[in-house]
Regions:
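Nucleotide and nucleotide-moiety/phosphate-recognizing core
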Residues: 2-151, 156-175, 181-182, 188-192
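Long, low-complexity, intrinsically disordered segments
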Residues: 194-197
């Protein structure tokens, strides 16, 4: 039966980072009994298509997987791989740095899209959330050009694109960033306390 809440877009979850500050693959870190990747996969369940994007597919991952088209490390390569392999106009680029993301926030981002824009971008206190944003498939030429010019910052791509920014200060908790083991321990503790109350 069709999902009435279905989002006509593709979600790409990036697992490709080296996680040097974290010390192990972030996607496999557990919060409660669930890995970060599984949490984000569930959060994206309203999207018509979901895929994991990374350098090479770990044996533990049984989900649909796209291998990056280049071995270089930067989220822009994951974005290029996602757009290149997508049949959808809109594509969510999502990193495993955001384990507390919710369906409601993704619905808000989707509901505020503007078909004249290249990127639909959440913004908290002036900080762009470039790895929790919708990217238009039409942007692929600009992404390719940026890669050729070795301009590998997604923020630089944002600065050169037609962007719709969404103020999401009230969603600060959902966009908590997990970069270090200390971040993970803090998030894990908070979530476990929430479920035990």
């Amino acid at each position: 039966m069709p999902n009435p809440n279905s989002i006509c877009a593709k979600a790409g979850i990036l697992i490709g980072g080296k996680s040097q500050r974290f010390g192990s693959p972030k996607w496999n870190a557990k919060i409660g009994k669930t890995s970060v990747l599984d949490r984000l996969w569930d959060v994206c369940s309203d999207f018509e298509k979901r895929v994991v994007v990374g350098k090479s597919k770990p044996n533990q991952i049984k989900k649909p997987f796209l291998s990056d088209l280049t071995a270089s490390q930067a989220p822009i390569f994951g974005l290029y791989t996602l757009l290149y392999n997508s049949e959808y106009k809109w594509n969510l680029l999502l990193s495993c740095d955001l384990p507390l993301l919710t369906k409601n926030l993704l619905k808000k981002i989707w509901a505020t899209r503007d078909d004249q824009a290249d990127i639909i971008l959440p913004n908290i206190n002036g900080i762009n959330q470039v790895t929790c944003a919708l990217y238009n498939k039409n942007l692929i030429g600009e992404v390719e050009k940026a890669i050729k010019n070795e301009s590998l910052s997604l923020q630089d791509l944002v600065n050169e694109s037609h962007v719709k920014k969404i103020a999401v200060e009230s969603w600060n908790q959902e966009l908590t960033n997990m970069n270090t083991l200390e971040d993970w321990k803090r998030i894990k503790c908070k979530e476990e306390n929430k479920t035990s109350n």
